[in-house]
Amino acid sequence: MTSPRRALVLVDVQLQYFSGPLEIHHPPHADSLPRITATIDAAEAAGIPIAVVQHSSGDQAPVFNPTMPEFALHPDVEARRRPEWKAITKRFSSVFAETQLLAWLRAADVDTVTFVGYMTNNCIIASAVAAEELGIDVEVLSDATGAINLANSAGFASAKTVHSTLMALLQSNLAAVAASGDWAAAVEAGQPLPKDNLPTSAVAGVARSARQAGQ
């Protein structure tokens, strides 16, 4: 089995997500942030290259405004930042859209990106989808990402529902999903994370639905 050539991508671990209407609620950022920093430490120890991404909506925007304090990285991430990290500022949901990330990954001979950060329901899912056509394998760490509560004209979904649903969706086709501790063990062993696929997920979904209907 070929060992993945990984890069860790820190997606928008910005202060914008730690208070206000965009505050991460599941997993709570009090839980996910320590998992993010532990993953950074594990990547550094293993010599895995790191890219740090910040979202900007422009200096007239009410959120993700680079002139406002909330644009900054969380201090626990900023304190670990090293000059060799690749710094990316994006304006679209995907970390690949109109950024230098792909070129940096190619130059480093990376074939697998590990995503941690926020939000599961926007930039993580968008980036995982974009990676497919680029031929980049994706890992998403379920306890080092997070979602918000959502309500709009189409309905309501709690952050827990959003996050757990998207983890199952990602694992079914677009990514290998795991907890940060399992990822660290896979890194140490030089192994890829296990990944399911759409047909087996569909078969298992039918069986699970039938069992629940029979209860």
Regions found by a protein language model. Give the residues of each.
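Short acidic, Gly/Ser-rich segments with clustered Asp/Glu that frequently serve as metal-coordination loops
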Residues: 14-19
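Short glycine-enriched, charge-decorated loop/helix-capping segments at active-site entrances
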Residues: 22-29, 61-64, 155-156
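N-terminal nucleotide-binding beta1-loop-alpha1 segment
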Residues: 8-13
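Active-site-adjacent betaalpha module
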Residues: 1-7, 34-46, 63-215
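Glycine-centered flexibility motif
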Residues: 2, 20-21, 58
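Von Willebrand factor
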Residues: 43-58
